[in-house]
Amino acid sequence: MLNCSNQKHTVTFEEACQVFPGGVNSPVRACRSVGVTPPIVSSAQGDIFLDTHGREFIDFCGGWGALIHGHSHPKIVKAIQKTALKGTSYGLTSEEEILFATMLLSSLKLKEHKIRFVSSGTEATMTAVRLARGITNRSIIIKFIGGYHGHADTLLGGISTTEETIDNLTSLIHTPSPHSLLISLPYNNSQILHHVMEALGPQVAGIIFEPICANMGIVLPKAEFLDDIIELCKRFGSLSIMDEVVTGFRVAFQGAKDIFNLSPDITIYGKILGGGLPAAALVGHRSILDHLMPEGTIFQAGTMSGNFLAMATGHAAIQLCQSEGFYDHLSQLEALFYSPIEEEIRSQGFPVSLVHQGTMFSLFFTESAPTNFDEAKNSDVEKFQTFYSEVFDNGVYLSPSPLEANFISSAHTEENLTYAQNIIIDSLIKIFDSSAQRFF
């Protein structure tokens, strides 16, 4: 049981709205797409957080995927306490920085590779794009509709392209707008990707992609799609940039790279990498990373890059991921949680899709699992809102958007997973058959 009894004043969301735009410091936290008042967290432990009204929630948001070990893991807390006594940020290279980078490259089996630490996934993807443009001396970046790579102007928006408009794409390079240099294509559509690269390949600096999409809900890749990205980049001399901010160290220790046997030019890590503190990294062969200053001529800098405290917590978090049986334990939790929900959906014939890869999952109110953003956004928003309110009112906190991912952590107990599972099942039953209720 968590305790906030020492709190003298119950801070409310209304107060947050007086000091933050929309009451939050990142938009989705406002819960506007699900119609509930956002909880204000007072403390968290394991798989539970407590809000300022004393309500306990089983947490499946997990710091948006950063907390694979749950909240306040003793070894991570100890790393913070021990490290903070030596300082928090030096603005200089630290011993911990070097040790952590060396351990990462070794454990990820990346020979002849280097790392550049930054403080956020946005910084990492922004730097990767700058590298791609600087190395190739080209301007165009390709991403995929529904894919999220941070909030830098260079990777937001873009052109939604179909085969009919390919002939007009060459005009893009003459328009001096960041978005005009970004082409957004449908995810999982190799045919359109091939057409665009045939037309513009020699002008494409790089292709950035999520191996498993996590910001249109969980959308899994078709077997050949990721291979096509890598092959086309090699063929046209473009850089392949794989964004594993969400999937890295989560779907497997070596991430989606291991699952799909991929060798991108640059890989982006974040979230789990920092152990709950702000840290991210771009990793690539030294022939690529050495283009960054001061070794090369491409600029990137950051006051907090590789800061001492985040390096120590990240080091502790990744070591925990390497502990014997860690991913086997996660697999057991996955099976315990997913299987009964999937069986209930099948047996009841609900038009709902539970999509999951490892400890990442999403519920779509659609007959079949989406394969791209257009299909994902066809999920029944009204039913999702009703569903979300039901689970929220019963102490289960899912990511507050139909197009966000949810996460299981190693801290989730079987008891809490079973409880959450029953709440999810009964919420679905309540929505589709109001006469059939087992737990409400």
Swiss-Prot record:
InterPro entries (UniProt xref): 4pyrrol_synth_GluAld_NH2Trfase, Aminotrans_3, Aminotrans_3_PPA_site, PyrdxlP-dep_Trfase, PyrdxlP-dep_Trfase_major, PyrdxlP-dep_Trfase_small
Pathway(s) the chain acts in: Porphyrin-containing compound metabolism; protoporphyrin-IX biosynthesis; 5-aminolevulinate from L-glutamyl-tRNA(Glu): step 2/2
GO CC, alphabetical: cytoplasm
Cofactor(s) required for function per UniProt: pyridoxal 5'-phosphate
One GO-annotated biological process of the protein: protoporphyrinogen IX biosynthetic process
Compartments, as annotated in UniProt: Cytoplasm
Keyword Secreted: no
EC number: 5.4.3.8
Family matches, as CDD domains: OAT_like (cd00610)
Class in the EC hierarchy, top level: isomerase
Pfam family, one: Aminotran_3
Catalytic activity reported: (S)-4-amino-5-oxopentanoate = 5-aminolevulinate
N6-(pyridoxal phosphate)lysine: modified positions: K271
Domain of life the protein comes from: Bacteria
Keywords: Cytoplasm, Isomerase, Porphyrin biosynthesis, Pyridoxal phosphate
Major location category of this protein: cytoplasm
Family classification: Belongs to the class-III pyridoxal-phosphate-dependent aminotransferase family. HemL subfamily.
HAMAP family (alphabetical): HemL_aminotrans_3 (MF_00375)
Protein name listed in UniProt: Glutamate-1-semialdehyde 2,1-aminomutase
Gene transcribed to yield this protein: hemL
